[in-house]
């Protein structure tokens, strides 16, 4: 009994990446932008896992651990910015972030 074919895993990863990219470009709310970035990072991690499984190498799993670490750091910095944006301007709109510099 074989597992899921590599093509199906890569198609799923590319669909998730495309959905994250669309969410990143279409939304103005910073919370949804952060969620879209997380979806994109997880889809890249899924592609690493699928490729590593296909060739029987543990490199995909190691790269996935690095992707998860990067995603956690990105989420913590992004949520800190989100909190400051909401405290100062009472909005989560991305355009208000450009006024945060002053």
From Swiss-Prot:
PANTHER family: NADH-UBIQUINONE OXIDOREDUCTASE CHAIN 4L (PTHR11434:SF16), NADH-UBIQUINONE OXIDOREDUCTASE SUBUNIT ND4L (PTHR11434). It comes from Chromohalobacter salexigens (strain ATCC BAA-138 / DSM 3043 / CIP 106854 / NCIMB 13768 / 1H11). Pfam families: Oxidored_q2. It is found in: Cell inner membrane. It is a multi-pass membrane protein. GO terms for cellular component: NADH dehydrogenase complex; plasma membrane. NCBIfam families: PRK05715.1-1, PRK05715.1-2. InterPro entries: NADH_UbQ_OxRdtase_chain4L/K (IPR001133), NUOK/Mnh_C1-like (IPR039428). The gene is nuoK. Its EC number is 7.1.1.-. Keywords: Cell inner membrane, Cell membrane, Membrane, NAD, Quinone, Translocase, Transmembrane, Transmembrane helix, Transport, Ubiquinone. This is NADH-quinone oxidoreductase subunit K. NDH-1 shuttles electrons from NADH, via FMN and iron-sulfur (Fe-S) centers, to quinones in the respiratory chain. The immediate electron acceptor for the enzyme in this species is believed to be ubiquinone. Couples the redox reaction to proton translocation (for every two electrons transferred, four hydrogen ions are translocated across the cytoplasmic membrane), and thus conserves the redox energy in a proton gradient.
